[in-house]
Amino acid sequence: MDSGGASDPSRQVRVRFLTKLPAPLRAPPTSIAVPADLTRMGLSEIVNSLLLAASPDHQAQPFDFLVDGELVRLPLQEFLLAKGISVERVLELEYVKAVAPRKQEDPCPHDDWVSAVDGSNPSFVLTGCYDGLARIWRDASECTHILEGHSDGITSARFINKGETEDRLHVVTASKDRSLRLFKFDTSVSVPKQIGAYKILRGHTSSVQSVAVDPSTNMICSGSWDNSIKLWSVEGSEEDGDTVSVKKRRTNSDSSGPEESLFEGSATSTFLGHTQCVSAVTWPERQTIYSASWDHSVRQWDVQTGKETWNMVSGKALNCLDCGGESSSLIAAGGSDPVLRVWDPRKPGTLAPIFQFSSHKSWISACKWHPSSWFHLVSSSFDGKVMLWDLRTAWPLASVESHKDKVLCADWWKGDSVISGGADSKLCIASGIEIV
């Protein structure tokens, strides 16, 4: 191969631009010569100029470029040299819309650290806070309901039903007070704004750190600092438990903490095996639960038998876990170092991660796969940053720096936005992310 000089500004490479984008964004497929030292920004300028020549109304936008399925993140000739591709061939460059936020929305202030977010509902965002309250935000801007009752900080919160066609929302929250609470309410009714739980779930002997909902939305599972995973029924009759009186969270105007009556439920199953805090759980398939722990392990559980069916030791205490990729077959996890790792449990005989992303500068606090893309993930870190990733490159697609302190949680919302919460007591929203 003719290596040439990677920094030689006179060297050129012949390229052909291809895309799967709709017709208005398709450049002519003829090959052209471009400078070999171009980066993706320079390549974007060329594509935009070609599109503008064909359509004067075209609005310039950034693109990313793939060669043989891998995103180009180096100057063109350096990339070719690294991959052993001849500079003499006509290089086919597939271009896609660049994945990066176009807008930072106004943050939503809270009274304490925002420790949990859920963006699985297209109309509402759910947040959990260290003030013991969960909040429902319409369009991530207006707080419509406050879910109260916990006596200590909320650590995790999830929508149970996604609410796409229903007026009623169903929510579960987990707390340092060792309990979980279930809420139901009508989103079309704004009064009362403060909502109490209809059911309290008790059984953990230490702080509940994580919660996940099964695909049928009939069950939930929780992970705790007592090292156990418990399964709970979302519904239930009074024959399954007792009605109890509990003191409501004290407020400044009512120091007595008035009592409320609600139904109490107990766990249907308990899974044992972890030796430290179960920091994250996910329930991707009806019969399979994955868990991550400060004991450095990721474990797979059979829901019916309660038995561990697979485990992997990462070497680091883990804070977060999610399943994604094709058929939700990949596992992403992060913890007490700056590296987000991805494993494929289908590969026998190896526990090495198949991808490692190492651009954060501190511990990873959360990771979530995009709901409709096999390739894209979001991560948050104690370094104050939220990063967007694509499996096809080791470099982050974008780094969002909306927070002024540690970021504790992050999620996708509506497919084109990222929501995050942190120690600066804010819910932040980065929007306009185009993933095709």
Curated annotation (Swiss-Prot):
A molecular function (GO) term: ribonucleoprotein complex binding
InterPro entries, per the entry: G-protein_beta_WD-40_rep, NLE, WD40/YVTN_repeat-like_dom_sf, WD40_repeat_CS, WD40_repeat_dom_sf, WD40_rpt, WDR12/Ytm1
Top-level taxon: Eukaryota
GO biological processes: maturation of 5.8S rRNA from tricistronic rRNA transcript (SSU-rRNA, 5.8S rRNA, LSU-rRNA); maturation of LSU-rRNA from tricistronic rRNA transcript (SSU-rRNA, 5.8S rRNA, LSU-rRNA)
Stretches the record annotates as Disordered: 240-262
Compartment(s) where it occurs, according to its Swiss-Prot or TrEMBL record: Nucleus, Nucleolus; Nucleus, Nucleoplasm
Region Ubiquitin-like (UBL) domain, residue ranges: 13-97
Cystine pairs: none
PROSITE patterns linked to this entry: WD_REPEATS_1 (PS00678), WD_REPEATS_2 (PS50082), WD_REPEATS_REGION (PS50294)
WD repeats: 109-147, 149-193, 203-242, 273-311, 313-353, 359-399, 402-436
GO CC terms of this entry: nucleolus; nucleoplasm; preribosome, large subunit precursor
Xref: CDD domains: WD40 (cd00200)
Alphabetical keyword list: Nucleus, Repeat, Ribosome biogenesis, rRNA processing, WD repeat
Alphabetized Pfam families for the sequence: NLE (PF08154), WD40 (PF00400)
HAMAP family: WDR12 (MF_03029)
Similarity annotation: Belongs to the WD repeat WDR12/YTM1 family.
Record function comment: Required for maturation of ribosomal RNAs and formation of the large ribosomal subunit.
Protein name: Ribosome biogenesis protein WDR12 homolog
Taxonomic source organism: Oryza sativa subsp. japonica
Gene name of this polypeptide: WDR12
